Amino acid sequence: MTSNAIRGIRRKKSSLCEVKVAVIGAPGVGKSALTVRFLTRRYIGEYDHQSETRYKHEVLVDGEPILFEISDTCPKSDDELPSMDTLQWADGLLLVYSITDRGSFNFVRKAKEALAVADPEAAMPLALVGNKADMVHLRQVSTEEGEILAKDFECWFSEITAAEQVAQVAESFHELCREVLAARRRNKAILAEPNARQ
């Protein structure tokens, strides 16, 4: 490989669009399963991690190469909301609850409230995911409740199952990426307006 070709590869890598996603949810909702499914296309049902884990993953979203940095958060209890550091680090939040756990649904509502208190002016891109949709016999949260919450949050929503739906899991991350990129374009346009410079 020539040195020009190597420089071209380096240039391409450095021009990758980076998107930082924090996966937020109560313990046991399948945050790690969703994240690993997205990263590797494999499903692993049991995880035992005691701290936040970060991953990097390059993928095409709508034909554009994106470097995802994903923070798989690890709250110790239903009362432990995302830290300010996590909220400030992230470009977007993937809020995950289990359709089989009413408490986890309430957790994502509280997490969103914490975000609003932390920065009332922020318009953090969000996506809401109801995981474990294959376990309808244990359902505690209706699809309609998820849709209403997503409408309140003004965000994309889907019910999925990390155990079975590779494409839908990827689409959750891709949709959040689209929201992050759209927010960046809006912010850039606002800064470019003549009145914004004064």
Question: Model-predicted segments: where are they?
Answer:
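TRAFAC-class small GTPase G-domain
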Residues: M1-N187
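Post-kinase regulatory C-tail/linker adjacent to protein kinase catalytic domains
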Residues: A189-Q198
